[in-house]
């Protein structure tokens, strides 16, 4: 019996919509990353992007446990000397709530060209509306 290897152009990709309201950030991000990679499919192949498209709505209502709401820090560098910038979870959620889920999922994907291709299939929206109704996304329930 030969080992099956999926071809990139033969993979069937579905669209799923996830409601992030009252979901724990890490548990939500791991399931999203798993589905973006395609690990939930029988035809998963490590060197081929077999994942689905994921639309995340209500990103502003995602929660974190413990004291992370005040203590969790996000850092980035501007590229200039002394240009390290920091923001707490609380401030980032007020300023750009979609960035929180994007950063959490991006950190769980491979750091290579294939990982960037997987990341492009993630669509995050702060509110409950999204412009992807033409793709007829299926509702995806993620347990707590």
From Swiss-Prot:
Record key words, sorted: Ribonucleoprotein, Ribosomal protein
InterPro entries registered for this protein in UniProt: Ribosomal_uL13, Ribosomal_uL13_bac-type, Ribosomal_uL13_CS, Ribosomal_uL13_sf
Listed GO MF terms: mRNA binding; structural constituent of ribosome
UniProt KW NAD keyword: no
Residue runs in coiled coils: none
BP GO terms, sorted: negative regulation of translation; translation
GO cellular component: cytosolic large ribosomal subunit
Listed Gene3D superfamilies: Ribosomal protein L13
Keyword Ribosomal protein annotated: yes
Pfam families hit by this protein: Ribosomal_L13 (PF00572)
Database matches in PANTHER family: LARGE RIBOSOMAL SUBUNIT PROTEIN UL13M, RIBOSOMAL PROTEIN L13
Function of the molecule: This protein is one of the early assembly proteins of the 50S ribosomal subunit, although it is not seen to bind rRNA by itself. It is important during the early stages of 50S assembly.
Sequence similarity: Belongs to the universal ribosomal protein uL13 family.
Quaternary context: Part of the 50S ribosomal subunit.
Name of the molecule in the record: Large ribosomal subunit protein uL13
Species the sequence originates in: Legionella pneumophila subsp. pneumophila (strain Philadelphia 1 / ATCC 33152 / DSM 7513)
């Amino acid at each position: 019996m030969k080992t099956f290897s999926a071809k990139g152009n033969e993979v069937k990709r579905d669209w799923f919509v996830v409601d992030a309201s009252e979901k724990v950030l890490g548990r939500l991000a791991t399931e999203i990353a798993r589905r973006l990679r395609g690990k939930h499919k029988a035809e998963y192949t490590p060197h081929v992007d077999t994942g689905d498209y994921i639309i995340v709505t209500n990103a502003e209502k995602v929660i974190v446990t413990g004291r992370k709401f005040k203590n969790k820090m996000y850092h980035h560098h501007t590229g200039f000397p002394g240009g390290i910038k920091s923001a707490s979870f609380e401030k980032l959620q007020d300023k750009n709530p979609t960035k929180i889920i994007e950063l959490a999922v991006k950190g769980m994907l491979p750091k290579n060209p294939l990982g960037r291709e997987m990341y492009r299939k993630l669509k995050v929206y702060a509110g409950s509306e999204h412009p992807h109704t033409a793709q007829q996304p299926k509702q995806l329930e993620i347990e707590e």
